[in-house]
Structures are given as structure tokens and as C-alpha cells.
């Protein structure tokens, strides 16, 4: 009887974790272009600016950051 309770608890826990991961993975991605910050911006400057403007400073949600001339291209996952 105790073994059944343990197995059931583990299964419920795994389903809960899988649901959290699926929810995070299912968030939509957005693409934006905006003026590059500073006089001599780098790709890293674009990534930081994108994170600050669109993801509340969460760098890990920035999927792609590119410097194109004097503009930044950014693809990020919504909060």
C-alpha cells in the first residue's frame, strides 16, 4: 500500500514538472527592430537593450540579437 502511494506521488510530481516546462516552452516569440544604443554599439549592447526593453531585464529570454547598421534586431520570448 505504501509503495502505491509513493509511485502515485512521483507520477503526480512528474506530471506537474512536465506541465510547467510545456507552459514555458509554449510562450510566443516576438521580433522587433529598434535604434541601437550608444555611438559604437555591439551585439551585446543590442542584447542588453532588448532584455531591458522587452523582457524586464531577463537576458535568457532573448533568443537572437543582431546589430544591423545602426539598428538592433531582436527576437525574444514573451514574459
Curated annotation (Swiss-Prot):
Keyword Secreted: yes
Organs and tissues of expression: Expressed by the venom gland.
Metal-binding as UniProt keyword: no
Top-level taxon of the source organism: Eukaryota
Key words, A-Z: Disulfide bond, Secreted, Signal, Toxin
Signal peptide residue numbers: 1-25
Gene Ontology terms: cellular component: extracellular region
Modification(s) after translation: Contains 2 disulfide bonds.
Location, primary (coarse class): secreted
Protein name (database record): U-scoloptoxin(15)-Sm1a
GO molecular function: toxin activity
Intracellular or extracellular location(s): Secreted
Organism: Scolopendra morsitans (Tanzanian blue ringleg centipede)
Entry's family note: Belongs to the scoloptoxin-15 family.
Amino acid at each position: 500500500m505504501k509503495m502505491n502511494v509513493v509511485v502515485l506521488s512521483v507520477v503526480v510530481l512528474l506530471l506537474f514538472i512536465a506541465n510547467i516546462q510545456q507552459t514555458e516552452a509554449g510562450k510566443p516569440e516576438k521580433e522587433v527592430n529598434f535604434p541601437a544604443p550608444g555611438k559604437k554599439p555591439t551585439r551585446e549592447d543590442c542584447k542588453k537593450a532588448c532584455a531591458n526593453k522587452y523582457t524586464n531585464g531577463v537576458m535568457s529570454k532573448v533568443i537572437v540579437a543582431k546589430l544591423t547598421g545602426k539598428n538592433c534586431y531582436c527576437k525574444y520570448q514573451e514574459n
